[in-house]
A protein has these predicted regions:
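Short, P/G- and charge-enriched loop/turn segments at secondary-structure junctions
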Residues: 1, 273, 303-308, 315
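A short, well-structured edge-of-sheet supersecondary motif
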Residues: 1, 28, 121-136, 318-321, ...
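Short, conserved catalytic-motif segment at the N-terminal edge
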Residues: 1-4, 25-27, 136-140, 144, ...
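Short active-site loop at a secondary-structure junction
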Residues: 1-54, 144-157, 234-237
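Hydrophobic "lid"/C-terminal helical patch
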Residues: 17, 249-250, 358
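Short, surface-exposed loop or secondary-structure junction motifs
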Residues: 44-305
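Structured C-terminal helix/loop/strand segments within mature extracytoplasmic catalytic/sensor domains
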Residues: 310-364
Length: 364
């Protein structure tokens, strides 16, 4: 199993959104505050579901919510520094080093599981139920800026969509997905928090030394910090899977909502979400798509504009091509052992080059 990072957006959250839309539970032009009460009265309350899906909400790309849980009095100097020094030895990115030692606030995290701290972040690290609520409160507040509605890819959009799914379905999103999709489709290797079902050795490690969680190898816990501090289940990241299971989802989309003789989504809903496109970016409704400018997008140059899918930071991608009846899934752990050594997959253009071979094979 692999941490599929932002491909959670289309392999999990978007499926739930499409299902609820199929059932007439919301409209694309509805304000998100209609379904997420914490946003009522907030400037963000007028953001529409369509804005979130197109990444045109005005919200920033991400936010370091985990800093709210860190006791600032527990370390000397700044948390990050641009160069190594006596208190900052662990490199986490190019010209970025993290403080050697710090503590979490006791009101938010504990080293032992309990009724008060039930959400596991890592080995011997648990967060309470209040912190995910605090994340939503911070999104609603003026602390997180709201800018113009141009295209700006944001994980926060899908954090809010997950909250909407849970408010409408009256179920935790991971349970809703298991009930409506993963269980019936035989996707036994697709789930959040995989250590609840699988042995550690069955899960590919993500990074060698995680600076937020005990400075140990991260295996079986989501890499994304937002998802981690929400207990592993978020709309932007958190899902673990393998290529075979992911291919089932995208084959279902290629086949207009059907898989294995069972209908999961209506043809009309599949066509709407897979064909509708933003007027100001290449984005579809929740999906990424090819760019009309050759060499600029995430897909092979020969991929038709009908293709939909998504990539993930940990080194994954999945693309459904309904025009040619093709599904392409690529999974890797490119940020292992160190997250700042991940550029090769992109600079070598490996994923689009493999996809290009598929289209060349069609011609041959």
């Amino acid at each position: 199993l692999y941490d599929i990072a932002s491909r959670t957006k289309t392999t999990a959250t978007l499926l739930a959104v499409m299902k609820l839309y199929d059932e007439g539970k919301f409209g694309l032009t509805d304000p998100i505050s209609k379904y997420v009460p914490v946003l009522q009265g907030s400037k963000k309350g007028k953001i529409t579901i369509e804005d979130l899906l197109y990444h045109q909400s005005g919200l920033p790309g991400s936010w370091p919510f985990y800093r709210e849980a860190i006791d600032d009095s527990s370390y000397v100097g700044s948390f990050f520094k641009a160069r190594i020094d006596a208190n900052h030895h662990l490199r986490v990115d190019n010209r970025l080093y993290v403080v050697d030692d710090f503590r979490y606030k006791k009101e938010y995290l504990s080293t032992a599981s309990s009724n008060e701290f039930p959400l596991q972040v890592a080995d011997n690290l648990f967060v309470n139920l209040e912190f995910p609520k605090r994340i939503l409160e911070m999104i609603a507040s003026d602390e997180i800026p709201l800018r113009d509605r141009r295209y700006r890819y944001s994980c926060l959009n899908f954090v809010l969509l997950k909250e909407m799914v849970e408010q409408i379905s009256k179920m935790p999103m991971d349970q809703y997905l298991e009930k409506e999709f993963y269980g019936p489709m035989g996707m036994e290797s697709t789930l959040y928090n995989p250590l609840r079902r699988f042995e550690r050795e069955q899960i590919v490690p993500t990074i060698q030394k995680d600076y937020l969680r005990n400075r140990k190898e991260l295996r079986g816990y989501v890499h994304d910090e937002i998802a981690a501090f929400m207990g592993g289940v978020s709309g932007n990241a958190g899902l673990f899977s393998n290529a075979r299971d992911v291919a089932k989802v995208y084959q279902m989309l290629v086949d207009g909502g059907q898989y294995g003789g069972k209908r999961y989504l209506s043809l009309e809903t599949c066509q709407l979400f897979m064909n509708k496109k933003s007027r100001i970016s290449r984005r579809g409704l929740g999906f990424d798509k090819p760019d009309s400018a050759l060499g600029k997008g995430p897909c092979a140059d020969e991929a038709p504009m009908e293709v939909v899918g998504h990539t993930g930071f940990t080194g994954t991608c999945a693309w459904a091509d309904p025009k040619n009846g093709l599904v392409f899934v690529f999974i890797s752990n490119r940020i292992y052992p160190r997250p700042f050594d991940h550029k090769g997959l992109m600079t070598l253009n490996i994923r689009p080059r493999i996809q290009q071979l598929m289209y060349q094979a069609l011609k041959d």
